[in-house]
Amino acid sequence: MNLRDACVEAAREVIAQEGIEHLSLRDVARRLGVSHQAPYRHFPTREHLLAEVMHRCYAQFAEHLQDRPSSSDPHADLHALGELYLDFALSHPLEYRLMFSTPWPQAAEQAELTADANQAFDTLRRVMARVHGVKSPTPAVDLDALFVWSTMHGLAGILSANCTTHLTLSPTVHKKAVAHVMGLIGRGLSHPAC
């Protein structure tokens, strides 16, 4: 592993173990056993390092969302996408938090972050365009995509924070939550309000 990649991995460890507020290039260097100046060859500031960590999280997320076979049924594809979203949130909590709960760093790499975030969102937009029966996104497609995203984000937040463990919900409810939510979304999209 080269020093740049090692710095990114060490940064992820710092964030996971101590929190993002404790991330520093000096701590990364100490963890790697290199001089305090070594990480600066690849990352001029802490913000640049954080931007690279987030960039890799978004790339991993986009790849995860695209890791599904496309079918001829856009509603089935939307359902699968919802399951993949939740699966990523629960199986990669650090990356999920970094993408959706961390203010974006003001670094030169912010353009890459924007491209990565759009790549992940475009996966949803393309499926939503198919649900709408159009070839490219329209304002209605984007509104519905934001609705689906915010719904899945809310469910992911509730489940990842274990908010439901203290409720008297049966294991069946937990098991069927995603399918139920995606079913309601599908019905709502079949009968749009506007």
Regions found by a protein language model. Name each.
Residues 10-18, 60-71, 151-158:
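Solvent-exposed, amphipathic alpha-helical segments
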Residues 24, 97-100, 107-108, 167-168:
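Short, hydrophobic secondary-structure boundary micro-motifs
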Residues 107-114, 118, 131-182, 192-194:
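Hydrophobic/aromatic-rich alpha-helical bundle segments in the mid-to-C-terminal region
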Residues 52, 66-95, 117-119, 138, ...:
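Hydrophobic alpha-helical connector segments
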Residues 15, 49-57, 99, 116:
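Alpha-helical DNA-contacting segments of helix-turn-helix folds
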Residues 6, 10, 14-48, 52:
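Helix-turn-helix
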Residues 1-2, 13, 191-194:
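N-terminal intrinsically disordered/low-complexity leader segments
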